[in-house]
């Protein structure tokens, strides 16, 4: 810890008091005073106002993909702010055009891009596009969406309705109509699913039971992230795509967390050989240096909106979505990922980190260690044979022990009652070998506290 003078200590204490008084840290409940107040950051490390350094093994909220302190991103935004600080996409500007083109390169297809600010907004946009698309194609009954239990898709009403986490919905219901849920794929708790693909078959049955003609689409993350890093069978997503095609539904892929290299591919769906109709993205698009999200739609969907009737157009406006500075910064962010081969680095470092954490399987409370790229989950259980989930208190002990040792890790809190039992790791791609060793050492030591 850096030395602090008495004046700095007093200023810091005052800052903590004001933080507790004025800033609502909703997920912390009654424990507002426990907040780490970040002051500066570089690479994978964050320094708080007490001068203490922490390795951020969650990239903020799964989003600072290229790491902290990249001055090139700040400079890209600054130069754009000087030239054109704002213009709405009711018209256009060069950074948005260039970024949309670049995203098409990354997606490997012919997509048209709608810009917003957050993952929740990107998913809300996708729902509206899908419903109107079917209407304009003459399918007037298609309004329902299928998602999976344990998945998270956002905190706005539509995105929360798609979310399969009851603890995130409780006290905010009733939510939007037309959202259905299927059991999630989870090869740890249901290893037979790798052969039977029963979790995909359930989506097929739901479409039949609900009447195919009423299903607008299926929304899914390639890997369920916030719900516990649930790994699907290899053939799962491809089968769901085939089911969607057979029933006339759209496949919407939520890449808000899995996208931009997090799983070791540009986008998570690329592991599974599918071509989604709609793709939503946020977080890593700017490495969180500025708010930006996008909803990418296949060109044939976009073409359905080109009619001349008064309500044929997509009547959806976003004031700040696709701001010039955010788009310019995103372009620089993607350029850095390309130039420094950070997606390959995510793949390689992720494989090494996952491999070194496998030793935790010997711990009596660890049931599974899993992941892809720099997206890793460690599931805690009471009993390895029955796989009964561990209490959240055990998870909290490990998280607290890591923080005390200078490591920030995540957990799947407030999701499904009884299943908040997964430690989560999603460090920045700029992680050094020394950083990786620190994560492994600290996590292993912290498990010795339970």
UniProtKB/Swiss-Prot annotation:
<dbReference type="GO" id="GO:0004015">
    <property type="term" value="F:adenosylmethionine-8-amino-7-oxononanoate transaminase activity"/>
</dbReference>
<keyword id="KW-0808">Transferase</keyword>
<dbReference type="InterPro" id="IPR005814">
    <property type="entry name" value="Aminotrans_3"/>
</dbReference>
<keyword id="KW-0319">Glycerol metabolism</keyword>
<dbReference type="InterPro" id="IPR015422">
    <property type="entry name" value="PyrdxlP-dep_Trfase_small"/>
</dbReference>
<dbReference type="InterPro" id="IPR049704">
    <property type="entry name" value="Aminotrans_3_PPA_site"/>
</dbReference>
<dbReference type="GO" id="GO:0006071">
    <property type="term" value="P:glycerol metabolic process"/>
</dbReference>
<dbReference type="GO" id="GO:0009102">
    <property type="term" value="P:biotin biosynthetic process"/>
</dbReference>
<keyword id="KW-0032">Aminotransferase</keyword>
<dbReference type="GO" id="GO:0030170">
    <property type="term" value="F:pyridoxal phosphate binding"/>
</dbReference>
<dbReference type="Pfam" id="PF00202">
    <property type="entry name" value="Aminotran_3"/>
</dbReference>
<comment type="similarity">
    <text>Belongs to the class-III pyridoxal-phosphate-dependent aminotransferase family.</text>
</comment>
<comment type="function">
    <text>Essential for glycerol catabolism.</text>
</comment>
<dbReference type="InterPro" id="IPR015424">
    <property type="entry name" value="PyrdxlP-dep_Trfase"/>
</dbReference>
<protein>
    <recommendedName>
        <fullName>Uncharacterized aminotransferase YhxA</fullName>
        <ecNumber>2.6.-.-</ecNumber>
    </recommendedName>
</protein>
<keyword id="KW-0663">Pyridoxal phosphate</keyword>
<feature type="modified residue" description="N6-(pyridoxal phosphate)lysine">
    <location>
        <position position="283"/>
    </location>
</feature>
<dbReference type="InterPro" id="IPR015421">
    <property type="entry name" value="PyrdxlP-dep_Trfase_major"/>
</dbReference>
């Amino acid at each position: 810890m850096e030395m602090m003078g008495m004046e700095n200590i007093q200023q810091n204490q005052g800052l903590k008091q004001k933080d507790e008084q004025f800033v609502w840290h909703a997920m912390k409940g009654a424990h507002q005073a426990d907040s780490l107040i970040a002051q500066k950051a570089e690479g994978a490390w964050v320094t708080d106002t007490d001068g203490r350094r922490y390795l951020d093994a969650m990239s903020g909220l799964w989003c600072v993909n290229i790491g902290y302190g990249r001055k090139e991103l700040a400079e890209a935004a600054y130069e754009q702010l000087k030239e054109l600080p704002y213009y709405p996409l009711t018209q256009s500007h060069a950074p948005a055009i260039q970024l949309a083109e670049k995203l098409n390169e990354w997606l490997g297809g012919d997509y048209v891009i709608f810009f917003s600010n957050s993952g929740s907004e990107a998913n809300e946009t996708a729902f509206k596009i899908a419903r109107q698309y079917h209407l304009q194609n003459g399918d007037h009954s298609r309004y329902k969406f299928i998602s999976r239990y344990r998945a998270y898709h956002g905190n706005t009403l539509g995105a929360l309705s798609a979310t399969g986490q009851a603890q995130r919905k409780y006290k905010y219901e009733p939510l939007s109509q037309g959202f259905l849920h299927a059991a999630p794929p989870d090869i740890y708790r249901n290893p037979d699913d790798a052969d039977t693909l029963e979790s995909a078959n359930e989506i097929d049955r739901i479409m039949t039971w609900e009447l195919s003609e009423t299903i607008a689409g299926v929304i899914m993350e390639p890997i369920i992230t916030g719900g516990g890093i649930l790994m699907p069978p290899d053939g799962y997503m491809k089968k769901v795509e085939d089911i969607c095609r057979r029933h006339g539904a759209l496949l919407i892929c939520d890449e808000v967390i899995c996208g931009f290299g997090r799983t070791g591919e540009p986008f998570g769906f690329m592991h599974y050989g599918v071509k989604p109709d709609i793709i939503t993205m946020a977080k890593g698009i700017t490495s969180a240096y500025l708010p930006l999200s996008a909803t990418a739609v296949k060109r044939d969907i976009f073409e359905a909106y080109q009619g001349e009737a008064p309500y044929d157009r997509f009547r959806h406006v976003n004031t700040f979505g696709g701001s010039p500075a955010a788009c310019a910064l995103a372009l620089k962010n993607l350029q850095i990922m390309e130039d420094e081969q950070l997606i390959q680095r995510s793949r390689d470092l992720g494989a090494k980190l996952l491999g070194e954490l496998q030793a935790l399987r010997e711990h009596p409370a660890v049931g599974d260690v899993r992941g892809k790229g720099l997206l890793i989950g460690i599931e805690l259980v009471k009993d390895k044979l029955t796989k009964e989930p561990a209490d959240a208190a055990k998870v909290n002990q490990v998280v607290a022990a890591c923080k005390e040792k200078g490591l920030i890790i995540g957990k799947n809190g407030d999701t499904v009652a009884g299943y908040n039992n997964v430690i989560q790791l999603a460090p920045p791609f700029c992680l050094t070998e020394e950083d990786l060793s620190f994560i492994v050492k600290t996590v292993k030591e912290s498990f010795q506290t339970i």
